[in-house]
């Protein structure tokens, strides 16, 4: 496996042998190592000295369920510290087929004599790197951009791309990836890494793995035995069965019962309309509607959990894919909205802009606190999201996330840690996750170490310190393997399958 290093200023590609010290690093572990070694801690996140690292997990490409995730890393314009966000989809798989252990993108595209650099596509294949103008798709939403690129390059490629939010360098912008059905629905959402990509004037990265090979396995027989055990443990786990039925929205009832469902700008942890936005209600609704609706859907090839979904409207036509728990919590209950159709429309708009639904839900909650909308008013929320697409001053304030919205609008209740919005787990009710928010270098991020499933008194702060620490260590390991958080169901039953 190699490290591919792209220098944007020189428009060059170097393929380097990965150091031996990196042989057991992948995903978050590898991106963190590279950033710590190569990026000045005091650099401007949107300046030329910041680097963007794409690192597939160690298990990516080996046909393990839920283990094809890709980590994106950079210094964050939101937290101002080291940041990793990961996503499912097909990009990591294509990278490993091309022999990439990591892709490092450094510098910025040079400007012409008028100070303009335009927008660019980076095309990567076994033949090397190619830079192509992208001004014809600048300003387009994620869905239209992906559609045009697939027509141009064919449906066999993988694509990592940004939407208008990334082009505007908004701090809540993420990086979208294609799922197994070629839909740009898998976003590395958190921390503003889409803005970092935008600062480098890259609209999209195209990965063409034609002629590539699957990554090598040192001991194929041992791997197969561990694979069988992992697959069995994953399939047999009761949580897998719950997610196969209801997906991540199954957490709505659970968190509401805990008092951990963010409600009206985190002023409460229980929502009177929780039942109408629950996973159980959504499943019944989608089954009745049929058409393009899917109650379960895999974002990666071969995933047995299939916790994703496609949310169809009354006519059965898809509105958005996926509609996840975090989005329901932040764009639903956190805004006092109890209608899934409205939440789905908001989700679609946020995703097409290339924004993080968590930070957008929190930013709109702050806007409601400031009097710019009433809690429960979904149409007004959609109007505020339209301000972002227009690029108005108000839209840019909201697009920078909840922390910026709070500072500009003078709101004191702002649910952020290290500048990043809290996920849909109220920290006063789930204190282990709250401890993770506070102690993780990544800020408020449930994927850094969520403790909701721990067998502990969630209201006992001291008892949850060790719980949070263990969860953070486990998640760092899963992120380095390229494993979805739910793949942990299989690993934690028999942890020995990992070293095997």
Predicted regions and their residues:
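Protein-protein interaction/assembly regions in multi-subunit complexes
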Residues: 1-194, 199-214, 220-239, 252-274
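Extended C-terminal regions of large enzymes
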Residues: 13, 150, 157-159, 164-500
């Amino acid at each position: 496996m190699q490290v591919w290093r792209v220098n944007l200023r020189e428009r060059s590609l170097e393929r380097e042998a990965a150091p031996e010290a990196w042989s057991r690093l992948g995903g978050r572990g590898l991106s963190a190592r590279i950033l710590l070694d190569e990026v000045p801690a005091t650099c401007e996140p949107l300046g030329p000295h910041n680097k963007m690292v794409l690192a597939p997990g160690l298990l990516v490409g080996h046909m393990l369920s839920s283990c094809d995730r890709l980590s994106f890393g950079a210094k964050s314009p939101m937290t101002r510290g080291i940041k990793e966000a990961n996503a499912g989809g097909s990009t990591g798989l294509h990278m490993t087929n091309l022999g990439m252990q990591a892709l490092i993108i450094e510098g910025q595209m040079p400007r012409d004599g008028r100070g303009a650099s335009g927008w660019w596509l980076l095309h990567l294949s076994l033949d090397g790197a190619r830079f192509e103008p992208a001004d014809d798709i600048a300003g387009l939403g994620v869905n239209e951009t992906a559609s045009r690129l697939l027509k141009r390059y064919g449906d066999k490629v993988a694509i990592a791309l940004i939407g208008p939010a990334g082009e505007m360098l908004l701090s809540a912008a993420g990086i979208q990836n294609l799922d197994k059905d070629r839909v740009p629905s898998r976003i590395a959402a958190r921390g503003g890494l889409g803005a970092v990509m935008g600062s480098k004037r890259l609209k999209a990265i195209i990965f063409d793995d034609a002629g590539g090979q699957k990554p090598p396995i040192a001991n194929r027989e041992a791997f197969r035995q561990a694979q069988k055990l992992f697959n069995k443990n994953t399939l047999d786990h009761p949580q897998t069965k719950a997610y196969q039925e209801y997906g991540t929205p199954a957490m709505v009832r659970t968190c509401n019962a805990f008092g951990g469902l963010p409600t009206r700008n985190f002023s409460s942890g229980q929502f009177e309309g929780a039942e109408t936005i629950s996973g159980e209600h959504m499943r019944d609704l989608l089954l009745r509607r049929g058409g393009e609706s899917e109650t379960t859907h895999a974002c990666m090839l071969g995933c047995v959990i299939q916790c994703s979904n496609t949310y169809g409207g009354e006519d059965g036509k898809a509105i958005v894919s996926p509609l996840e728990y975090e989005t329901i919590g932040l764009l639903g209950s956190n805004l006092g909205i109890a209608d899934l159709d409205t939440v789905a429309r908001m989700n679609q708009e946020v995703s097409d802009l290339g924004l993080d639904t968590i930070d957008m839900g929190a930013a709109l909650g702050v806007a409601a606190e400031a009097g710019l909308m009433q809690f429960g008013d979904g149409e007004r929320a959609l109007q505020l999201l339209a301000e972002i697409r227009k690029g108005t001053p108000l839209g840019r304030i909201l697009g920078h996330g909840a922390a910026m919205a709070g500072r500009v609008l003078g709101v004191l209740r702002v649910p952020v840690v290290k500048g990043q919005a809290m996920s849909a787990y109220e920290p006063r009710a789930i204190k282990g996750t709250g401890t993770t928010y506070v102690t993780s270098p990544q800020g408020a991020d449930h994927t850094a170490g969520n403790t909701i499933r721990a067998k502990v008194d969630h209201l006992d702060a001291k008892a949850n310190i060790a719980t949070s620490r263990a969860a953070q260590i486990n998640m760092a390991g899963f992120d380095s393997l390229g494993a979805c958080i739910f793949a942990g169901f299989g690993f934690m039953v028999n942890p020995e399958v990992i070293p095997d």
